[in-house]
Amino acid sequence: MAKLTKKQKALQGKVDSTKLYAFADAVVLVKEAATAKFDESIDVAVQLGIDAKKSDQVVRGAVVLPNGTGKTTRVAVFAQGAKAEEAKAAGADVVGMDDLAAQVKAGDMPFDVVIAAPDAMRVVGTLGQILGPRGLMPNPKVGTVTPDVATAVKNAKAGQVQFRVDKAGIIHSTIGRRSFDNDKLQGNLVALIEALNKAKPATSKGLYLRKVAVSSTMGVGVRVDTQSISA
């Protein structure tokens, strides 16, 4: 574990772990603690009121953050014919079929998102053991297996993030960078929370959004009052 700087230790002492902070105040604290020389990611962790062990309570989906992620997303598309041309026109970085599969098998994967047209899944299906562990396997639940490859590419490039609850019932996601102003970060968080609410399992009982915490890549985490999260 990396050692905390004197400034981070001082800020850590200012954060009351038992207190819920308004989002605007939480972001101020998180940005003060983001002392790395690079533009740190601002991340959120959302504890959901679900039982992640039950298959009907697995929360998964995707949402386009209105203010982007601050990251350049490289997109690969498995498609052929007209769909391949549509993907290229939409800005895909790599487009192919068997040739792209061979590239993946060789370990050459300079991309962050993989999209597939439905008729390409016969090829993509053979790559599950490679793409799956890297979180790159296309899935219709997050819109990466779709006949509308052009829109999928545009969404990925525009700042779409995928989310999936972990075994502890927590969703982890970025909402931008330290360089983003607070309004942009809040707008992105609102979009994420709205997407999580839409993905709420029908079998989930009680309080759904239990805890929200915001942090930077190298900084301390601050708990957020969910009532303060609004557009």
UniProtKB/Swiss-Prot annotation:
Molecular functions (GO terms): rRNA binding; structural constituent of ribosome; tRNA binding
Any one of the GO BP annotations: translation
GO CC annotation terms, alphabetical: cytosolic large ribosomal subunit
Keyword Iron: no
Pfam families, per database record: Ribosomal_L1
Record-linked InterPro entries: Ribosom_uL1_bac-type (IPR005878), Ribosomal_uL1 (IPR002143), Ribosomal_uL1-like (IPR023674), Ribosomal_uL1/biogenesis (IPR028364), Ribosomal_uL1_3-a/b-sand (IPR016095), Ribosomal_uL1_CS (IPR023673)
Signal peptide: none
Keywords assigned: Repressor, Ribonucleoprotein, Ribosomal protein, RNA-binding, rRNA-binding, Translation regulation, tRNA-binding
Job of this protein: Binds directly to 23S rRNA. The L1 stalk is quite mobile in the ribosome, and is involved in E site tRNA release.
HAMAP family named among the record's database cross-references: Ribosomal_uL1_B
Family: Belongs to the universal ribosomal protein uL1 family.
Subunit structure: Part of the 50S ribosomal subunit.
The protein, known as: Large ribosomal subunit protein uL1
Species per Swiss-Prot/TrEMBL record: Paracidovorax citrulli (strain AAC00-1)
